[in-house]
Amino acid sequence: MPGNSIGKIFKVTTCGESHGPMLAGIIDGVPPGLSLNNKDIQYELNRRRPGFSKFTSQRREKDKVEIFSGIFKGITTGTSIGIRIKNIDIRSQDYSEIKNLYRPNHADYTYEKKYGIRDYRGGGRSSARETAIRVAAGAIAKKYLKLQHNIKIRGYLSQIGSIYCPFQSWEEVEKNPFFCSNSEKIKKIIHFIKKLKKSGNSVGAKITIIAKNVPIGLGEPVFDRLNAEIAHSIMSINAAKSIEIGDGIHVAKQTGVEHRDEILPNGFSSNHSGGILGGISNGEEIIVHAAFKPTSSIKIPGKTIDTFGKKRFIITKGRHDPCVGIRAVPIAEAMLAITLMDHVLRFKAQCGK
């Protein structure tokens, strides 16, 4: 599978499956001299890890990261950073009854048709379990971007099902298990999730990720425009179905006067473009919205076929998130950080600043 790496200079390569012994990653391109330890990475992993909220998957993984290369006396050496995370809470028996069935809306069907073989245990490589390494790599990128350029990347839940969550405060985001910034919506979300879990159903969600203090000049037109690279990274996340930058799909109903970000001596009058013009960052906040489909593994019987092409009904057991979009917040933050880190280094390599 050649699609296991992302980035040109800051390059992240991952490997591992949902029910394999571990997940691992190699991060290339980290400049030497960056102070880095397990705690820097663990904080971000703890935000993503499953099993510590009754509203997400009950698979309990500690997600303790181990750095095994690229660090000497707590400082990056400029060589490849190797990281690994052990899988501990594996229950492969939950999938024994459906190993010959294709789960609707999962990667089971396409993986087997492409490769002629698939790991049915928790989805194998196609599982969102793989994103733990992305979050670890993103933690490194976040630290470098904050220390070198004061770039801060944060995200929040902006919609779950039909519940809209207008932004209220960043302080509220870390106070609840939904990454919701609006305290007035928490009780409604809790009631909604409980109802979903009881019925065995799931729901989609929309999240918003914002990068602040991004310098002017990031992005490589024409094919590696910053918005194109961000779209690539976000859409590589499991269950991601759409991405918007700035006003996104709303630009279709705007006029030129409404949409244009007028330029004033002290900056732009608005940010409809989401911080990117001509594929290059313009110094404004980069604003990204991403929508995630409902969890495909649900306990409500559905139609499918088996590996022999015969009609079957399927109920997916196991421990699954009623809404995968919730835990996508730290994952999307990580992917935006990885993309910006790569482009910061590419800018320095080309422009020498």
Curated annotation (Swiss-Prot):
Cofactor: FMNH2
Single GO BP term: chorismate biosynthetic process
Pfam families xrefs: Chorismate_synt
Family annotation (Gene3D superfamilies): Chorismate synthase AroC (3.60.150.10)
Reaction equation(s) it catalyzes: 5-O-(1-carboxyvinyl)-3-phosphoshikimate = chorismate + phosphate
E.C. number(s) listed in UniProt: 4.2.3.5
Cofactor comment text: Reduced FMN (FMNH(2)).
Keywords tagged on the record: Amino-acid biosynthesis, Aromatic amino acid biosynthesis, FAD, Flavoprotein, FMN, Lyase, NADP
Pathway: Metabolic intermediate biosynthesis; chorismate biosynthesis; chorismate from D-erythrose 4-phosphate and phosphoenolpyruvate: step 7/7
Function comment: This reaction introduces a second double bond into the aromatic ring system.
HAMAP family found in the cross-reference section: Chorismate_synth (MF_00300)
Subunit (UniProt): Homotetramer.
Family: Belongs to the chorismate synthase family.
Protein name listed in UniProt: Chorismate synthase
Organism of derivation: Buchnera aphidicola subsp. Cinara cedri (strain Cc)
The gene coding this protein: aroC
